[in-house]
Amino acid sequence: DSPMSIIGDMLDMEIFEEDQSKTVPFDAFLDGVVVIALDALGQDDHSKNMLVAVMLNMFYENMLRTTKLPFLGQDPQLRAIDSYLLVDEADNIMRYEFDVLRKLLLQGREFGTGVILASQYLRHFKAGGTDYREPLLTWFVHKVPNVTATELSALGLSASASEMAERVKALGNHQCLYKSFDSPGEFIRGYPFYELMRARGEQ
């Protein structure tokens, strides 16, 4: 489908507001937690991907206008976080190798913007000529039945990749392999939201 036909479909679906008095600036739109649910578009992947591309570009342009915050602390010295962008089922956009996604990954830290890409398989992070694994410093690998030692080695876990691959295949709910710049790789258990709410209710 040509871009114009996809845009025509989006107009027909009335995705965007016509009355400018009912719209808000993008930075105001992003105030707080914002979830863009694409399931309402049904099986129309072309329109979904076009909408994601539009949102990524607007997010990037907004990021460039963000005031750079000073570092926090001295030892360690950490970057202040302004916002996080989470893309679920990210393989649907990584395959298109959008230049704006690469820019967000490479430039985001400078502006205190983090990008979280969630996908079912590690092989999704190598798309065509773009290797999305390179700019990603932190990984949470949940149960992946067919994960290989080679895939984990590509994340910098070469020391015991074979053993870790076998453990990843058998992980339970909320368990994952955690890897970051200051962690060579360890297995941890996440804190489910329902447990957090239960703990708050008991206080």
Region annotations inferred by a language model:
Residues 1-113, 126, 167-184:
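P-loop NTPase motor domains
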Residues 44, 160, 200-203:
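Alpha-helix capping and helix-coil boundary motifs
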Residues 185-203:
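Charge-patterned, long linear interaction tracts outside catalytic cores
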